[in-house]
């Protein structure tokens, strides 16, 4: 199991409804159904992933979150999850607002562009980094709006979006991020997981 999925599962209560936006092959939904007995639905843009989810018995619809989330009623899910997809949207602010409208809470995870290995790659090699969490070259990446944990933390503050908890992940550990340790955790976390709303 991916460490990120475990950290997300630790936040999600049992027996609730979850919309997984950009659900990919449905691995996270499958985990949450098994471990948390959730009622899950997915929204995925790639047809091959939608077919894979459906073949696994998962409830998934094909669509683009930027154009389809408006069709979901307000507060229609207990949680809405957006796992490592925020940076791929043309208008991430609109998507975040829709997540928080559709769900009572949202979990958003991001690859952290402030991670020390990313910074080092830019500093010493002078080129866009390729890592496990940022696996594409600059010319074939779906990422449009790279940000750091600190950027998203500050964005939420500026837009009055309530942050319930922020978790940082790296190779060896999972740790909570607060204002008091934000600078250090922004440097040493590969992934940031935000529980919002």
Which stretches of residues belong to each language-model region?
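Conserved alpha-helix/loop element of class I SAM-dependent methyltransferases that forms part
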Residues: 1-15
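Alpha-helix C-terminal capping/helix-to-coil transition sites in glycosyltransferase folds
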Residues: 14, 75-76, 102
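Conserved class I S-adenosyl-L-methionine
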Residues: 16-24
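Structural signature of beta-strand start/N-cap positions in the alpha/beta core
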Residues: 17, 39, 76-78
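Class I SAM-dependent methyltransferase SAM/SAH-binding core
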Residues: 27-68
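Short conserved loop adjoining the S-adenosyl-L-methionine
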Residues: 68-74
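A short SAM/SAH-binding and catalytic strip from SAM-dependent methyltransferases
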Residues: 79-91
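S-adenosyl-L-methionine-dependent methyltransferase catalytic module, highlighting the catalytic core
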Residues: 93-98, 105-197
